[in-house]
Amino acid sequence: MIWHVQNENFILDSTRIFMKAFHLLLFDGSLIFPECILIFGLILLLMIDSTSDQKDIPWLYFISSTSLVMSITALLFRWREEPMISFSGNFQTNNFNEIFQFLILLCSTLCIPLSVEYIECTEMAITEFLLFILTATIGGMFLCGANDLITIFVAPECFSLCSYLLSGYTKKDVRSNEATMKYLLMGGASSSILVHGFSWLYGSSGGEIELQEIVNGLINTQMYNSPGISIALIFITVGIGFKLSPAPSHQWTPDVYEGSPTPVVAFLSVTSKVAASASATRIFDIPFYFSSNEWHLLLEILAILSMILGNLIAITQTSMKRMLAYSSIGQIGYVIIGIIVGDSNDGYASMITYMLFYISMNLGTFACIVLFGLRTGTENIRDYAGLYTKDPFLALSLALCLLSLGGLPPLAGFFGKLYLFWCGWQAGLYLLVLIGLLTSVVSIYYYLKIIKLLMTGRNQEITPHVRNYRRSPLRSNNSIELSMIVCVIASTIPGISMNPIIAIAQDTLF
């Protein structure tokens, strides 16, 4: 009799759990429809990989690209809808989160065609590569919409695990193995530091995990100005700093950039920064609302160190990928200016605008590096000497992307930096803006040094790599060239397109 009653209670409890899960999927699942499309794409890839004897490579790329494009379409159809919180407060959808999700999807969509020829030439496993790219994209999208501490911790771990696997994808390469080990160890340490900061925030707020409820909890417990909040702020800043890779949390960046496959570096260089920026703005702006002066000071120090160290050390680099690694450290210093400015003076809008341009500039540069590496087998800067004499189109494309990264007018990078620095100046961040302007001049110097190498025609400076350079047939490498052309066009957009882009960015503010 007792067993019968216990069995009935177990069935009732199981039914309640099932109905609750069904209710969440039915009513809240529509709010993560773009992510569900990518999950469905993952399942299709696994099914094709497990059922097909011979890998149908075009279909694998088609499914991956189509799922990303469909996810972007679903995201655009949801634009301007009312903000909603779903999954018991764990996930929030609003224009601010969705613009960052769009940027992550855009990065992934451009990175897949950029990787096609590289994967085929290096004989890397295709299915697993695409699975990791899509899974990392899903993790980044969930991080952008995360509304509680647990989701904010789990989502980047999903992204990070895929990043570790992608960075060590060429297992026979000693540099790749070394980079992966450093990346994994430092990533694990940063995650521990981040969750320790979350524990201080959780305890100080009286056991709350949702971002807005943490603010209410801090008010109720009168702990919003306590030393515990300062400790939480320091630990969380260090943890997020690893994802953004500003100085001094940048030690992993040059090694991972140099040792990882170039398409992987292109993917990580933009998606990790977009996702981490979205998370950082929400964490600093909501739970640490009462500590704005403290986190402003911390971020100002990080921005100054990043802009100075990143651009100065980039001058001394001989590897193209290491140079771009230090350049990205400097670039994130500019982005931090927008985070500090915040809502008050269009800081977030300027940050979003600049990140959109940064995606095109950076991916365009990496597309050129992938093409040059496949045709010559080298990544050293000096081996680019005289490339214009052999492949003017590739040399001009690389030059335009580098000049845009430097911020020379009338390229997109100039208008992005101008808007970002203007917002910083209006907010009173005079020191940061002046340092940003000076370090931008420094970056133009080392970019122009590379462009001078590209355009040189003196035989004594041309290395054997370029002297024996052979352009591939027109039909070959067309996917990489397609990504490169799209990114180059986006990097050279004149100022006439700035007004609609800024208007869209301003519309995302929460």
From Swiss-Prot:
Molecular function terms, GO-annotated: NADH dehydrogenase (ubiquinone) activity; quinone binding
Name of the top EC class for this enzyme: translocase
GO cellular component: chloroplast thylakoid membrane
Membrane topology: Multi-pass membrane protein
GO biological process, one term: photosynthesis, light reaction
EC number: 7.1.1.-
Localisation per UniProt entry: Plastid, Chloroplast thylakoid membrane
Organism domain of life: Eukaryota
Pfam families: Ndh2_N, Proton_antipo_M
Keyword annotations: Chloroplast, Membrane, NAD, NADP, Plastid, Plastoquinone, Quinone, Thylakoid, Translocase, Transmembrane, Transmembrane helix, Transport
Transmembrane segments: 24-44, 57-77, 99-119, 124-144, 149-169, 183-203, 227-247, 295-315, 323-343, 354-374, 395-415, 418-438, 484-504
Reactions mediated catalytically: a plastoquinone + NADH + (n+1) H(+)(in) = a plastoquinol + NAD(+) + n H(+)(out); a plastoquinone + NADPH + (n+1) H(+)(in) = a plastoquinol + NADP(+) + n H(+)(out)
Stated family: Belongs to the complex I subunit 2 family.
Job of this protein: NDH shuttles electrons from NAD(P)H:plastoquinone, via FMN and iron-sulfur (Fe-S) centers, to quinones in the photosynthetic chain and possibly in a chloroplast respiratory chain. The immediate electron acceptor for the enzyme in this species is believed to be plastoquinone. Couples the redox reaction to proton translocation, and thus conserves the redox energy in a proton gradient.
Subunit: NDH is composed of at least 16 different subunits, 5 of which are encoded in the nucleus.
NCBIfam families, per database record: NDH_I_N, PRK02504.1
Protein name: NAD(P)H-quinone oxidoreductase subunit 2 A, chloroplastic
